[in-house]
Amino acid sequence: MEILCMKTMKWIPWDNVLATGHARLDADHMILVDLFNQLATSIMERKGKVDCVNLLDKIVRHAKAHFEFEQQLMAEHRYPNTEQHTAEHVRLIAQAIKYIAKIEADSPGSHIPVIHFPEDWLTFHILAADRELADFLSTTDATAA
């Protein structure tokens, strides 16, 4: 999957590869993808640290709400991998907060790891963990939640 499309200033084009089949999860993921793309534009257009920090903060706030919803689903449906999935949520939020702190401190090269953040999120969370959760939920009639 091509993460950064320089011509369109998009890191992540939304397509069926990213869809889990769960309406609410997919809607939340679309918002995250849009926020990541806004962050890509901010970095590419060198809009500055305030803009990057504001966008990362929006990503964190949306992700926290999304993760709370996922954790509620996991509890309601007794998802067997809840502990591992929740640990991944904690790791992703901590990673984003670390990037915010580095950017605010004007650490040299602080924007570089941020560029790879969406790839990590996609590869290790949406495409793997969230898809596994959605597959589990589809067997418990929870797809429309």
Predicted features along the sequence, with ranges:
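Small-residue-biased structural context
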Residues: 2-145
